[in-house]
Amino acid sequence: MNLSEIWLREYLSINLDLNEIINRITKIGLEVEKIIPVSMKFSGIKIGKVISCKQHPKCKKLKIFLIKINNKNIINVISDYDKSLINKKIAVAVNGSILPNRTIVEKKFLYGYESCGIFCTYDQLKIFGLKETSKDIIVLDKNAIIGEDIKNYFFLNDNIICIKVSHNRCDCLNIIGLSRAISSEYNELLENKLINKINSTKDYGFKIKINEPEACPKYLTRKIKYINLNVNTPIWISERIRRSGFKPKNIIIDIINYVFIETGQTIKIFDADKISGNITVRFSKEKESMMISKNKKIIIQKNTLVVSDKNSIIEIAGILLGYSARIDSKTTINIIISSVLYRSKFLFGNSVKYCINSDLAYRNERNMIDPNIQHLAINRATELILRFCCGSPGKIINYINNKFLPKKILIKLYKKKLYEILGFFISKKLIENILLLLGYKYEFIKNYWKVSVPSWRMCNVKIEEDLISDISRFYGFEKIPIDLSYKKIKYNNCKYNINTLNNAKKLLTNRGYQEIISYTFVDKNIQNIIHPNKIPVPIINPISTEMSVLRLSFFTNFIQTILYNQNRQTKYIKIFESGFCFSKNKKYKLGIKQSFFISGAVSGFKNVESWYSKQREIDFFDIKGDVETLLYLNGNSSDFEFKTCKNKEFHPGKNSKIFFKKKYVGIIGEINPNIQNKLDIKNRIFVFELLWDNIKNFYVPKIYNISDIPFNYRDISIVISNKIPIIEVIKICKDSIKKELININIFDIYQGKEIKKGHKSISIRLTLQNKNYNMTNLEINSILEKCICNLKKNFLIEIRTIC
C-alpha cells in the first residue's frame, strides 16, 4: 500500500516527524518498505503564461516565446516547441533556478537573441508518478496561479510511504484505519474528520430489492440529479490518488478512488438514466451474460451474486461493473451511488473465475471491509461530488438486514492466561487503558474481561490470543523484561513411557532423510488431485490462490518439493516433516480436526552407478524398512501390522495401512501413477504417514534370562493363494506355537510352472526353544503338526516339504 505523507498527516492530531511516523507504523506490526520523495530537490521553478510566439529570425527550428511570470515580469524564452502553447500555463525555470541535476539556469544568447529561462518537462524535474509521457512540457490547468512556485501547485513537499500490510492488520489498508492505529500509540483517539452528513429528504422514486439478504445484508444507495461531469479533477485529489497507485481518469472515478483509499469502502456509481426499474441483488441464472465493454460480453456462471436492473446484469457483485449502466462524462447528468456490504463467502473465487485482478475484489472476497463504514463512505462521496460537480442529492435508501450482519465478537480475556503468555506483570488499569485506546470495549467480571471487538477489527481479532498479541504490541516489545527468572515455569515429570519426537527425527536423519519445513497452506488444485475424495478446510483470507486451503496431509508439500528438486537434476531425495494436518470434522471445535503426523517421502535412485554396483530405483520395501525401524522405537514392534488396502491416492498393489494393536496408526505406499502423470513427476514417489500420538508411547520390553538350551530349527514349505497376506500366515504360526517360538522368518517365496496359477510357495523357518530343557523330536513334531493343522484350517494350504 502506498500513500501520501501529507494526506496521512491530515488525520493525525499530533505533530510527528517522518521517522517517528515510520517507527509507529512498524510498532503497529506493519513494514515500511521504502520512502519515496515525490520529487528531487530543485528551486525557482515558476508557473508562467505563454503570451505570444514568433519565429526566430536567424534559426528556422527555434521560436521566441513571451512568458508572463507575474504582473511585473515578462521574459523571453527561446525553444523549439510549437505555437500550440500560446495562452497556456506552463512550468518555467527562470534565471537562477536550480534543477534536480544541480544545473543552474542562466541567461543565454541564441543567435543574438536573449533567452531568460527554459520550459520544464516532467522528466527534468524528476516528479514521481506524473505523466507517462514524462518528456512532455508541464502544461497546467486554467486555475493555476501565475508566479506560484511549482512545488506548491503539485504539493511536491511530500513523500510516498510504501507499506507492506500484513494479513492480520487489514484495518490499516486505508488512511482512516492507519491514522487510528498510529493515534492510539500516542494515547490519542482518532478524531472523525469526515462527519459531513448530507441531510436530504428528496425522494427520486427508485427502489432496491435484495433477493439474497444473507449474501448482501447491507445496501445503501442514493440518487444525485443534475450533476456536471465536465470538470477537471482538483490537482490535490488527482495527485493523492496517483501517489497511492491509482491513475486519474475523470472527476467521478477519481472521487470513488479517493474515498476508497480514505475509508477502505468502495463506492459504485451507475448512470441513473440507463437503469430500468429497480436495482436487484440476486444470484444469476443459467446462460446469463453481462456487457463489459461496447463490443464484449462475458457469460455469467449460474449462482454468481450479481446486481441487475429490470433488463440486464449491471454488476458482478463486489467484483466488476458492467457496461450497460456505466457513466459517461459527456452524457451522464443523473447518477446512483451505492455503498454495499457483501459477505465474503458468497464472493470468494469469483475474481479468479472471471479473471479480475483488483484490490477491490481481493478485499471483498476476504472479509476485509469494516461493516460499519458504509454510511460514512457514501456521505463522503456525496460531499465531494456536490463540492466539485454540483447536483441535487436524494435521501439515502437503506436496506439493512440485522440477522445476517456480522455478529458482534465478544471474547473472554482471562487474567491468568494473559500473564502466563506474557510472562510478566502488567497492571489491570494499564491493560484496560490499552484496550480502550485500541477501540475495544470491555467489562471486568471476577477474573476475566469480557471484551467487545470494534467493527474495524472484526476481520482479524477472533480469539483470546489476538487480544493478548495486541496488548503486548501496544505495551511495547522493547519493554518486555530481559530477565524472566520470576516467571513460573512448569516442568513435566520425566517419564520412561515417552518416545520423544527428537528420537524419531534423529533416526530418520541417520537413515539419510532431510527434514523440511513447509507452509500449512497448500495449493487447492494440487491437493484435490492427490486427495480427490477429501474436502479441505478453506482459508478465509489466503495469502494467494496457491495457498488457499489447509493441508490434509504432507503429501502435497512433499510432491511439490520433490518436483522442484527433480527439475534441478537431484536424482535421490529422502525428506520428512512433522506437524499438524487438518480435516473437516463436526465433532471438534470449529468443525476442524487437527492431527499431528510424522511423514516422509523418498524418490529416485538408491545408489550411484559404479564399477561394483548398478544403479537401482528405490522401491516399496526400502521405505517400508525405514518405517519399520521407526516403529521399533515404540519398543513393541511385534504388535504392528501392515495390511494392504484400496486407496485412490496410492498404487493399487503397493500400499499398506499400519495398525498397532488393531488401531490405525498410519499408511505407506507408492503415489498412484495416474497422479504422477497428471503432475508430470519423473520418478516414482513413495510416502509414509504416521499418527504420532498413536505411536509415541514407549512400551518397556520384557527382559528374559539367556538360556543355555540350544535352539531347534525347522523349515516348512507351503503353497497358498496369492490373495492371502503373508502377515496372516505368520500370525497363525505365532498363535499356534506361542511360548516355544523364538523367531519366525520367511526365507523364500517362489512362483513358477510347478506352482498352480494364482498361488505361491512360501518357505518358513521356525526357531524353537524351551528355556528349561532340550526339546525332543516328538515335542517338536507335535508343535509343527498343530501349526500346520491351523494353517490348513484357515487358508487351505498345501504342504510341500517339512525339514
UniProtKB/Swiss-Prot annotation:
Q: Which PROSITE patterns match?
A: B5 (PS51483), FDX_ACB (PS51447), TRBD (PS50886)
List keywords of the entry alphabetically.
Aminoacyl-tRNA synthetase, ATP-binding, Cytoplasm, Ligase, Magnesium, Metal-binding, Nucleotide-binding, Protein biosynthesis, RNA-binding, tRNA-binding
Q: Which reactions fall under this protein's catalytic activity?
A: tRNA(Phe) + L-phenylalanine + ATP = L-phenylalanyl-tRNA(Phe) + AMP + diphosphate + H(+)
From which domain of life does this come?
Answer: Bacteria
Q: Which Pfam families match?
A: B3_4 (PF03483), B5 (PF03484), FDX-ACB (PF03147), tRNA_bind (PF01588), tRNA_synthFbeta (PF17759)
Ranges where the FDX-ACB domain occurs? 707-800
> What is the name of the protein in this document?
Phenylalanine--tRNA ligase beta subunit
Q: Which gene encodes it?
A: pheT
